[in-house]
A protein has these predicted regions:
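Glycine/proline-rich active-site loop of Rossmann-fold NAD(P)-dependent oxidoreductases
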Residues: 150-152, 201-208, 233-242
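Substrate-positioning beta->alpha
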Residues: 121-124, 174, 192, 221-231, ...
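Conserved beta-loop-beta element that borders a ligand/cofactor-binding pocket
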Residues: 179-200
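Conserved Rossmann-fold cofactor-binding substructure of NAD(P)-dependent oxidoreductases
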Residues: 80-102
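NAD(P)-cofactor binding segment of oxidoreductase domains
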Residues: 112-140, 171-173, 177
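Non-catalytic terminal and boundary segments that flank Rossmann-like NAD(P)-dependent oxidoreductase
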Residues: 1-39
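N-terminal Rossmann NAD(P)H-binding glycine-rich loop of SDR-like oxidoreductase domains
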Residues: 36-61
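N-terminal Rossmann-fold cofactor-binding loop
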Residues: 68-73, 88-89
Length: 248
């Protein structure tokens, strides 16, 4: 019983830490403003589940896409308007080279080093922002997750008391740092916080806002619909400088 209570205390404490560490959006009236959709887009994390969807859907929208990847063979997408650059987000030189000439950057950065402390997400994001500033790229759309900042506890009991504290504490702490770094920057940014991801087909619809998710059950969304939402933010100011939840 004592160990169980200590574990519950640990999980609750971690949720509070994530709440304070991540960005806390101030809900403001939606401007509804739109702008010309960027045609030259850099996608970081392009070989992940969401990243591949971003590449495919951006190409469908007519964008000229640059994908920064560590292993080009993992992307498995061929297209005349796709430029694949081999590099590492932790290497500023490769990030800077990939950012040159872009109009916007989309980050679906992730990794699978879950079980020890890492700053891959936050350090990589610093390099992205530095390169954007160097080349005058103004718009960043970044994927993090529900369960961070003012969405802490909104991934349901299963994530709050098992998945995050047992499997992903370091990952979520670094996502929190990533959000804070973005929020402190001068770029035009939107953070997308999806619920639990799956590989279902795109439904073309989603719920999004500052109060998405709940404390009891886990909300879900496909990677395809997350990619669709993120691409829509390139030409919309509705959630400018906000961290917004997105789910079905």
């Amino acid at each position: 019983m004592t160990l169980f209570l200590l574990y519950i205390l640990y999980a609750l404490t971690l949720s509070i830490v994530l709440s304070r560490a991540g960005h806390r959006s101030r809900a403001v009236p939606a401007s509804g403003a739109t702008r010309r959709h960027p045609t030259r887009v850099l996608i970081v994390g392009a070989t992940g589940g969401t990243g591949r969807q971003l590449v495919a859907q951006a190409l469908e929208r007519g964008c000229v896409v640059t994908a920064l990847v560590r292993n080009p063979l993992k992307l498995q997408i061929k297209h005349p308007q796709l430029n694949v650059i081999q590099g590492d987000v932790l290497d500023y030189a490769s990030v800077e080279a990939a950012t040159r000439g872009q109009e916007a950057v989309i980050s679906a950065l992730g990794h699978k080093r879950f079980f020890y402390p890492t700053r891959i997400l936050s350090a990589g994001t610093r390099n992205i922002l530095r390169a954007m500033q160097a080349h005058g790229v103004s718009r960043l759309v970044c994927e993090t997750s529900l369960g961070i900042g003012d969405s802490a506890g909104r991934l349901g009991l299963y994530f709050t008391f098992f998945v995050i504290p047992v499997l992903l504490p370091f990952y979520f702490l670094d996502k929190s740092r990533q959000e804070r770094i973005i929020a402190a920057s001068d770029v035009e940014w939107v953070i997308a916080r999806p619920g639990m991801l799956n590989n279902n087909k795109k439904q073309g619809r989603s719920r999004h806002g500052w109060k998405i998710g709940n404390a009891l059950w886990t909300v879900r969304i496909s990677r395809a619909d997350v990619a669709d939402f993120m691409l829509n933010q390139l030409a919309s100011d509705r959630y400018l400088r906000s961290a917004v939840g997105v789910c079905w």
